[in-house]
């Protein structure tokens, strides 16, 4: 937000330097990025009156005689296409300094003496993006009242101090001059002085000319006024100066008025050419799939059902809250203007502007919030300005659809609550003084008082917000300072810390690289891979929709990282993360979410590169499962893998739930090809585990098992069974035989082919037996194999080959 110090002083009677003001604002909660004076570095720039202008034959040059307040006119050679006799211009006399510290000297051009330079605004250092288009390719023409020889700075307000504020999402009220004025008035104990406009209305009612309606719950209110017989022309110089100093290009008096109101009230507005309407009813609704709109920048925008549009005759004429449409824009022939003042859902506007990469001053304010109480006041103010600057006739009244609460919000607390949290000994009189400076109403006493918070401060809704306001105005530098008190802690890791350290070591030993992803994501991604989604916990004032909800899974964030790396030609990835997910079992507005530690990893690409000995090997489900098997083995935990098709974003044939003591603690598998395509990533395998469940299941004592000196015996068995029987089912059947000496089950072959009946497969296992106290005999092992074979036959219908 760029704040004009001159304009601010018109609204608040302060007598401090811009630097002192910036320092004070920074220490009370609104950071000042810097102060800029447009005239800084410029010198000897004066008003010139072009007395005569003659074309130089066979060139684009003009030989001008210019009155700069000296005894005799000054001859200047100028190449600007818009220079002519009779206009007032900017003249840099010899010795002047212009942009980039360039010094002007006397010189000769084509043999003609030139005693100075007639300047454009670009040559004074102003950006092309804010210069009026009529002067973008030529020199700036000054107002008629400019006096030759005067310094030009006061005519263009280049001597103003422009204070750049860094506005956080919770202080969007300061995205307006009135909001900044209220803040400065509170800091210095002053009162604000806002100019009033005398609106003269005609006998004809606005309702006779226009009708408005709302057809979406994302449009909170929509109001319009009509101004007839306007004369579209350039704005007066003071208004152009003000807009350029705020970083906005002047267009014409009608559009400039809407931008002025935007800066003054923080209320985005739009002006339509009424005569270009095909109907006299305006409807604000959601766009339909397949609709499109050519916006004011000449770009055709394809719309989705997530976008809001303003329609006339059921055709979009504006992209609500973002940019108007080209078909109804104000031009030099416009005579009747429809003014729009509305409030749109900030999340919807953020999605639209982000999707289209179309950020504007209006969309920024709708995203962060506008003052409900001044929507109609801003509309009336704009109409009065058009009456004043465009000689328009304002129709009586306004038309409006949708009502907004405008009364103050009441928040109650006590003096003890404030003092305990600030460590102060403030009196109730101190509290009264502070809220009086802020312009807030106050009733009650020190035991219990209620503050009436104006709608312009929509960031204040709970007692803690009041404490912050008190601290800001009282002065952070006045708060007592104390050293933190902390008792000694035992020099050992907690069980949670120990588990995190062990899992981290195992993951890195398996070749995984740790990442840290955002805990905040989009509402859609927050629940994308959650096994059991809960209520969403969303920020009230998010910086962007991409960081608006607390995650309920970690995989979606990892896939964002995978996509980032793949887009940069890094496709062989093995990543892991240990972090928190946030489960909300109750209303998020009433209680905080539960924070649960999770472990997740993602692998894609090649696990082994091609070389002279081996072929390249791509990652697959078994690589992902192998990582987990190693993890569980080192944690001394026994889990089950159960195939599942219930996770919508996972491959239905290559995904398994992970069960520990019959409870689901996570999943492993391939990301669904459709989801992978949406993320623009290759075939990727992921897993996610609940570390809290792992910690709870860890054995309390580690029992040492002596390494036996007796050898193990191995037997292989090949099974013919139905194609649908899983490896886990076979392992369960083998274990259910109850053979104590069975120490290891290993699958070493799976075969389906011409020698196997259709619908069947062959699976071969290696079974390891060992007695820690004695040698095993062949007869004992044969009995074990007989029990296992019987179990396999009875439970899975296996045929031993």
Curated annotation (Swiss-Prot):
Residues 406-481 form the B5 domain. Its main location: cytoplasm. It holds the Pfam family B5. It catalyses: tRNA(Phe) + L-phenylalanine + ATP = L-phenylalanyl-tRNA(Phe) + AMP + diphosphate + H(+). InterPro entries: aa-tRNA-synth_II/BPL/LPL, B3/B4_tRNA-bd, DNA-bd_dom_put_sf, Fdx_antiC-bd, Fdx_antiC-bd_sf, NA-bd_OB-fold, Phe-tRNA-ligase_IIc_bsu, Phe-tRNA-ligase_IIc_bsu_bact. Belongs to the phenylalanyl-tRNA synthetase beta subunit family. Type 1 subfamily. Its cofactor is Mg(2+). Keywords: Aminoacyl-tRNA synthetase, ATP-binding, Cytoplasm, Ligase, Magnesium, Metal-binding, Nucleotide-binding, Protein biosynthesis, RNA-binding, tRNA-binding. One of its GO terms (molecular function) is ATP binding. Residues 39-153 form the tRNA-binding domain. One of its GO terms (cellular component) is phenylalanine-tRNA ligase complex. Binds 2 magnesium ions per tetramer. SUPFAM superfamilies: Anticodon-binding domain of PheRS (SSF54991), Class II aaRS and biotin synthetases (SSF55681), Nucleic acid-binding proteins (SSF50249), PheT/TilS domain (SSF56037), Putative DNA-binding domain (SSF46955). It is found in: Cytoplasm. PANTHER family: PHENYLALANINE--TRNA LIGASE BETA SUBUNIT, PHENYLALANYL-TRNA SYNTHETASE BETA CHAIN AND LEUCINE-RICH REPEAT-CONTAINING PROTEIN 47. Gene3D superfamilies: 3.30.56.10, Bira Bifunctional Protein, Domain 2, Ferrodoxin-fold anticodon-binding domain, Nucleic acid-binding proteins, Phenylalanyl-trna Synthetase, Chain B, domain 3. The lineage of its organism: Bacteria, Bacillati, Bacillota, Bacilli, Lactobacillales. Residues 708-801 form the FDX-ACB domain. Tetramer of two alpha and two beta subunits. Mg(2+) binds at residues 459, 465, 468-469. This is Phenylalanine--tRNA ligase beta subunit. Its EC number is 6.1.1.20.
């Amino acid at each position: 937000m760029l704040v004009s110090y001159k304009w601010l002083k018109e609204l608040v009677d302060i007598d401090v330097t811009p630097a002192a003001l910036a320092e004070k604002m920074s220490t009370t909660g609104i950071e000042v990025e810097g102060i800029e004076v447009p005239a800084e570095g410029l010198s000897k720039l004066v008003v010139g009156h072009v007395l005569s202008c003659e074309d130089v034959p066979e060139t684009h040059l003009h030989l001008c005689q210019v009155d700069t307040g000296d005894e005799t006119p000054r001859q200047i050679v100028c190449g600007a296409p818009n220079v002519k006799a009779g206009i007032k211009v900017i003249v840099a006399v010899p010795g002047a300094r212009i942009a980039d510290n360039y010094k002007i000297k006397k010189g000769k051009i084509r043999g003609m003496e030139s005693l100075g330079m007639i300047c454009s605004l670009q040559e004074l250092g102003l950006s092309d993006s804010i210069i009026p288009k009529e002067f973008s390719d030529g020199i700036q023409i000054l107002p008629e009242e400019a006096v030759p020889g005067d310094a030009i700075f006061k005519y263009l307000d280049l001597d103003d101090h422009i204070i750049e504020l860094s506005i956080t999402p919770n202080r969007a009220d300061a995205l307006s001059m009135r909001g900044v004025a209220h803040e400065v008035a509170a800091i210095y104990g002053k009162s604000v002085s806002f100019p009033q406009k005398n609106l003269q209305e005609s006998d004809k009612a606005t309702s006779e000319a226009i009708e408005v309606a709302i057809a979406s719950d994302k449009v909170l209110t929509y109001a319009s006024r009509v101004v007839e017989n306007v004369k579209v022309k350039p704005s007066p110089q003071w208004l152009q100066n003000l807009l350029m100093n705020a970083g906005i290009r002047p267009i014409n008096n009608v559009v400039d008025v809407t931008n002025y109101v935007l800066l003054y009230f923080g209320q985005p507005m739009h002006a339509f050419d009424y005569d270009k309407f095909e109907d006299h009813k305006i409807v604000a609704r959601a766009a339909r799939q397949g609709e499109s709109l050519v916006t004011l920048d000449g770009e055709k925008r394809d719309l989705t059902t997530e976008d809001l549009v303003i329609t006339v005759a059921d055709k979009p004429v504006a992209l609500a809250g973002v940019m108007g449409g080209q078909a109804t824009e104000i031009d030099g022939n416009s005579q009747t203007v429809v003014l729009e003042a509305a409030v749109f859902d900030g999340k919807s506007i953020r999605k639209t502007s982000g999707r289209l990469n179309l950020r504007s001053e209006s969309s920024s304010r709708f995203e962060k919030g506008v003052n409900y109480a001044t929507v109609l006041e801003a509309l009336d103010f704009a109409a009065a300005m058009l009456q004043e600057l465009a000689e328009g006739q304002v129709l009586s009244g306004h038309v409006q659809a949708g009502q907004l609460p405008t009364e103050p919000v009441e928040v109650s607390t006590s003096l003890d609550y404030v003092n305990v949290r600030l460590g102060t000994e403030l009196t109730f009189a101190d509290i009264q003084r502070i809220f009086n400076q802020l312009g807030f109403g106050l009733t009650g006493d020190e035991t219990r008082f209620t503050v009436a918070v104006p709608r312009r401060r929509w960031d204040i809704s709970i007692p803690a917000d009041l404490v912050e306001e008190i601290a800001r105005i009282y002065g952070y530098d006045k708060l007592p300072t104390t050293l933190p008190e902390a008792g000694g802690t035992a020099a050992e890791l907690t069980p949670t810390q120990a588990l995190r350290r062990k899992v981290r070591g195992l993951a890195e030993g398996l070749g995984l690289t740790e990442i840290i992803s955002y805990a905040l994501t989009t509402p859609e991604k927050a629940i994308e891979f959650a096994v059991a989604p809960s209520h969403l916990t969303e920020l009230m004032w998010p910086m962007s929709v991409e960081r608006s909800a607390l995650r309920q899974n970690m995989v979606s964030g990892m896939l964002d990282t995978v996509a980032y790396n793949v887009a940069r030609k890094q496709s062989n990835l093995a990543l892991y993360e240990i972090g928190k997910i946030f489960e909300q079992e109750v209303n998020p507005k009433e209680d905080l979410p539960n924070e649960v530690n999770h472990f997740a990893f993602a692998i894609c690409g090649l696990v082994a590169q091609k070389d002279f000995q081996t072929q390249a090997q791509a990652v697959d489900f078994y690589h992902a499962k192998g990582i987990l098997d190693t993890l569980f083995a080192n944690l001394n935990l026994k889990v089950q893998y159960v195939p599942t098709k219930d996770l919508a974003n996972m491959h239905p044939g290559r995904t398994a739930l992970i069960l520990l003591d019959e409870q689901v603690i996570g999943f492993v598998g391939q990301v669904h090809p459709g989801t992978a395509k949406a993320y623009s990533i290759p075939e990727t395998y992921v897993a996610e585990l609940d570390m809290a469940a792992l910690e709870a299941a860890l054995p309390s004592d580690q029992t040492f098992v002596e390494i036996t000196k007796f050898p193990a015996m191995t037997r292989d068995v090949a099974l013919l069974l139905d194609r649908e029987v899983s490896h886990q089912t076979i392992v369960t059947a083998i274990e259910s035989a109850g053979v104590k000496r069975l120490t290891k089950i290993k699958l070493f072959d799976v075969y389906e082919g011409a020698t196997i009946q259709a619908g069947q497969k062959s699976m071969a296992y290696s079974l390891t037996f060992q007695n820690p106290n004695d040698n095993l005999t062949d007869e004992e092992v044969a009995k074990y194999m007989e029990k296992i074979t019987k179990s396999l036959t009875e439970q899975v219908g296996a045929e031993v080959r």
